[in-house]
Amino acid sequence: PRSTLFPYTTLFRSGKVNAGMCTQILADIFGVEAVINTGIAGSLNNDVNIGDIVLSTDVLHHDMDAIGFGYKKGQIPQMDEFSFPADEKLRKLAAKVCKEVNPEISVFEGRICSGDQFISDKSVKDAIISEFGGFAVEMEGAAIGQAAYLNHIPFLVVRAISDKADGSAHMDYAEFEMAAIEHSVKLTVRMIQEL
């Protein structure tokens, strides 16, 4: 552990613009050396169940569509990158810490797809899977990843799965949210201690 470690914790409203702005503020004002973002997401993979954790290998914008200008779906115009790679060192540390802190929870590593919409329709979910693959779908990770990437800051997006992204959620959202927050706090505190 570094003796100079001083973490900043932020809270922002939902959506990609808010997430990107928050990340840019962390870069510009606080000069952060890494960004670890935790939250909840819907599952895009049949093996990833409610309560499981997904650690990002990369993040992308599933709702970006500039095909008419010759870009791939998901690719931001005038950028070569199709997705933004998460930091491997942070991901390995998170995987290790997850097993130590929450051994009963399954941990997956994979792509996280972001868009400014809550996915609860199976046909929309299936379209995202067909186009991009991925393990989880949510509303902030790609903006965080993009801002971190453009600022040359290592990042990791960590998501607890809250639903199957198909309208079949059975657990009370407030109940799940509290459990997810508890797991995320344990994970983040432990990761910071080991950085």
Language model features with spans:
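N-terminal beta-alpha supersecondary unit
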Residues: 9-21
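A C-terminal functional module that forms or caps the active site or interfaces directly
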Residues: 117-166, 170
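Alpha-helix C-terminal capping segments
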Residues: 25-29, 47-48, 146-154
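Mid-sequence, gly/pro-rich, charge-dense loop/helix-turn segments that line enzyme active sites
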Residues: 44-132
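Single conserved hydrophobic/aromatic residue that forms the stacking wall/gate
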Residues: 1-10
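His/Asp/Glu-rich mid-to-C-terminal helical/loop segments that flank catalytic regions of hydrolases
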Residues: 165-195
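Proline-aspartate-enriched helix->loop->beta-strand connector
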Residues: 32-33
